């Protein structure tokens, strides 16, 4: 039943975005989303942002979908709302319908991209720059014990509050990986500023057959992107897995409070760590879970000339990571480039300034861990 409702809502959204209508000075007119900034316009329509072309016409798809798919009851009073599991960010990921619905939302963007012309060899090629090889350390995943302080979520009496010795910790097993480095050997015939894009994706399907590149392109995840200055001749670019635009495990409130108080007493220096963002992709999830015998994946590295983005940052880096600001760009190339469009001819995709490298991800058995995992 819920799957049917999800498809119905998604179908209505598809009809709405097929012929975008914008309102200006009370006059409605159609908008061609296949022109410049059309992808952003499509995102505004689906997300129902304040700057959407016509909020009253398109409505709030995701908000309504969460209410309908979550079987939320209509509140009898504005202050007596009973939100469903899907309407809580903390619990939405536990409902299978969440993934079905957002897979459909993602499909709209992929469908949009499928109507754009494929990249030509000339567009992808960077004359004079060649990636000779990519060397990657051994990749290992494992589950470790992650402990976090939940004291603030519990009620304590005045005596316990004054003593400040009442602590409750929760322990959870989370996927992690052994930090690794990779080296990119690049030959350049000139001094030039470039942008490296590093992707990781599967190679074989569940039957052990190699996945065609055009079908497999949506499975590649960009986990690193950085600007680098190439010198004339051979360049060895070394990069660590901790250097990407990812988020490390957060410092607990108690630990942060203790550091601040110690700094105020002159017992230690308090350093503002700007690398600790409140939102972003967790660094511990860079690698998918491997197998004990090893699971084959593919590294893909692409080099393009560096061109400064026209979007200037509009957020304060001290208090925000800039997620959702629309200004976190290294250059003007689209997200996921060059996998964002259909690959019509594979021979035009394999340019000298790109490189596929097979890697094997191993998973460390639980019995080899420092702390064995109890069975629940």
Model region roles, listed by residue range:
Residues 19-376:
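Intrinsically disordered, flexible peripheral segments
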